Amino acid sequence: MIPHRQNVLAALTGIITGRIAQINAVYRGGPSFYFYHRILDLRRQYPTVGAFLASTTCIEILYAALVSWDMNSRGAKMKDYDDFRNNLQGNINVFQSVEAAANGCTWANRSPVVQALADLYDRLSLMKTKKKLVSNSKTMHFVFPAL
């Protein structure tokens, strides 16, 4: 356990939010930055995960965001778009379970959302390779940015 955890988290949050413009200027720009903000904007436009994943545009931008974040380079190979889309849309009910568990979630009652996220992680199959840590965690962040 981290001593004074809440104080440490509050301090880190303050640093990040207070310096976000500087952080953004130093780190990623270009296509990855564009698609990251585009997917977050789209997620805000679609208040339910079911509506978000039913949108062809949202799935396409999600795919492009992952590609721009190097998910289809070096050893990482994403599935073809149709397989990617089918896996996401075939798991809408699992995404909706995360959404339901996250509603009203607090640190004290986090177990249901953690379990729902673990279930979703296990069900996602977005890569041609068996490696899925980065692709699945990025996808889950793009779809559930508040978690």
Provide a role label for each language-model segment:
Residues M1-T129, A146-L147:
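An N-terminal alpha-helical hairpin/helix-loop-helix interaction module that forms a charged
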Residues S135-T139:
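Conserved beta-strand->loop/alpha-helix structural units within folded catalytic cores of enzymes
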Residues H141-P145:
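Hydrophobic/aromatic-lined pockets within catalytic cores
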